[in-house]
A protein has these predicted regions:
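Ser/Thr/Asn(+Pro)-rich, low-complexity disordered segments
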Residues: 1-231
Length: 231
């Protein structure tokens, strides 16, 4: 783990045999939470507390739509580390200062997602209290289309996020489902609504990984639908 610091305090984004260390580092709150926990727990080459503090010093605490939380735009950032650790009641120095924990932070991030969809600042089709889920996902692009008098640029795979974007109207139902532990009171109604409003999204493999109602598709009243699934 100390090797992965590449001479710095925060972890390198990665290493390739052909080119060596990547130029970027794991800084700012993200799915790297589990990475730093693993590094701190190593019995032989552990990261130091100084390294962890250097990472948390890059955090951004924001108030969005009335919710104060540790900011991360894409929803997956608030979900992946929780697959392995139940963070309820676990606080580091940063979260103690905020009187919160990472589980509560993910709950607030889920509500921010819903509120963004309700406000729908960019005017995408279908966004609302029961249609949200903006995260890293496949998209219908790269393409530019004129939709209801507005020129819109659509992306392919991209880490989409709220409230600062990027956002091109692409939604991921799996991201909603993955928020079930944090906010079941808004997740379950959303999944139920999507099951009725978008029955074409589900097949024998489950839900498709993403869809975009705003992207015009000839012969379809539902817009773009990904052909991929997440297992």
């Amino acid at each position: 783990w100390r090797w992965a610091l590449n001479g710095g305090l925060t972890l390198s984004h990665g290493w390739k045999p052909e080119t060596g260390f990547l130029r970027y580092r794991w800084e700012g709150y993200s799915e790297a939470l589990i990475l730093y926990v693993l590094g701190l727990g190593s019995p032989t080459h552990a990261l130091s507390a100084r390294s962890y503090d250097a990472w948390t010093s890059t955090y951004r605490w924001k108030k969005v739509y009335g919710h104060e939380f540790l900011y991360g735009g894409p929803l997956f950032m608030h979900q992946l580390s929780h697959i392995w650790i139940d963070f309820r009641g676990i606080q580091d120095a940063y979260m103690r200062r905020q009187s919160s924990d990472y589980f509560e932070n993910s709950r607030r991030a889920t509500y921010v997602q819903q509120q963004y969809a309700i406000r729908n600042p960019k005017g995408f089709r279908d966004y609302g209290a029961h249609v949200w889920g903006i995260t890293a996902s496949n998209g219908p692009g790269p393409a530019t289309r004129r939709v209801r008098g507005v020129t819109r640029r659509f992306r392919a795979y991209l880490a989409r996020g709220v409230p600062h974007g990027p956002d091109d109207g692409t939604l991921a139902p799996w991201a909603v489902a993955a928020s079930l532990p944090f906010a079941p009171e808004i997740v379950l109604p959303t999944l139920e609504h999507c099951g009725h409003a978008y029955p074409h999204m589900e097949n024998e493999y489950g839900l498709v990984c993403s869809f975009n109602p705003t992207f015009p598709v000839p012969g379809s009243k539902h817009g773009w639908l990904s052909k991929d699934h997440f297992a």
